[in-house]
Each structure stands twice: as C-alpha cells, then as structure tokens.
C-alpha cells in the first residue's frame, strides 16, 4: 500500500510511510484487500492528496471514513463516483449551497471540481470494508491523517478548516497556528442538519475569507453529468 504521491505531499509525507504504525497498517491493508471487498480501490486511496497539493490547499473539509457501499467511495470525503445516488449528507450540503448561492442541486455527487480548486476533501480514515462502517478505525490511518493536518497547520499561508460534527471538531487541537481559520457547525447528516448546519453559510464564509486574503474564491457549483 505504499504510495508514491506525485506532488509536494510526497516529500512531506515520505517519513510516515517508514514509521512502525504505517508498516503495521500496510500489513493489515494487504490482508484486507486480499480477503474482503474494501473501498475505495487501492489506486484511489490517496486521491484527496493527489488532487489537492499541499501548496495549493486553501480549504480542508474533514470527513470520517469512506462510504462503504458499492461504487461510492473514490478517495475524496463526501464525494461519490459518477452515476451513484447522492448520499443524504451531501444532498444536505447541496441544499445549503442552493440556499446560499441559488445553485441548482446537481444530478451527481462528484466533487472533483472542488478538489481541483484547492479544497482538500480529507477523511480521517482512508479505507473501509464493504458494508461495515468504521471497520478500519483505529488501524493507523488516524496517525497518518493527523500528520496531514499538522503539516497544514505548520504552513504560514492560511488554510480554512471546515469541521462539521464532533468527530471533525476533535481535530481542532491540531490546529494551533493563529494564521488559520476554522468554520464549524453540526454535521450535514439528516440526523443533525436542522440543528445548525442549515443556515450556517459555510461556502460564502470561505469565499469571504479568501477574498479578504486576495485569493481566488471557490466556485462551489457542481455541474450536471
């Protein structure tokens, strides 16, 4: 499972691949992928980092673990592959986007357009067994993705961290650099969205911060496929 990241993350994260926790994770993953159906596909595990380089990261949207249904996960938090029904949390994200900007809700949940603009769509756990949520929790991925957050925290150029729900907000302790911005609310899940996600205006808050920094704003509109 050792992966050669082709952008600046490669050099920054190279030491992680040599650490004991990652060696153990690697053994676990090789066994899991050989015995079970695991998502995403091996070649998609690090897509969040592949699509959004360290230098180009403007925003981080932190998720938990990948979708565990067929053909959903492809390495980006909240995003699903083309042709797959939009999951409920992402649908609520689209509803909030519609209310903020008037965009129509798209016919897909493919968020690569965001990733290509500097939105790092990072899950804290990068793999999952089919049909078993959180099945790869506590196996080592958290150490790896914490290091991603720590590296971004070390950056002078500000990063906007979007933390939805308690799981994501637990990572606030890693964001100690006052250069950075944190936007938080309850999770967009149908279980909690009406308790403070709807109306929280995360997308326009991001763009206000970027505009004040003199940075290009994110075009949040996802096109139909």
UniProtKB/Swiss-Prot annotation:
Domain of life: Bacteria
Gene3D superfamilies: Uracil-DNA glycosylase-like domain (3.40.470.10)
SMART domains documented for this protein: UDG (SM00986), UreE_C (SM00987)
One of the protein's GO biological processes: base-excision repair, AP site formation via deaminated base removal
Pfam families tied to this protein: UDG
EC number(s) from the headed UniProt entry: 3.2.2.27
Keyword Hydrolase: yes
Cellular component terms per the entry's GO annotation: cytoplasm
Record key words, sorted: Cytoplasm, DNA damage, DNA repair, Hydrolase
Reactions catalysed according to its record: Hydrolyzes single-stranded DNA or mismatched double-stranded DNA and polynucleotides, releasing free uracil
Physiological role: Excises uracil residues from the DNA which can arise as a result of misincorporation of dUMP residues by DNA polymerase or due to deamination of cytosine.
Name of the protein in question: Uracil-DNA glycosylase
Organism from which the protein derives: Bacillus thuringiensis subsp. konkukian (strain 97-27)
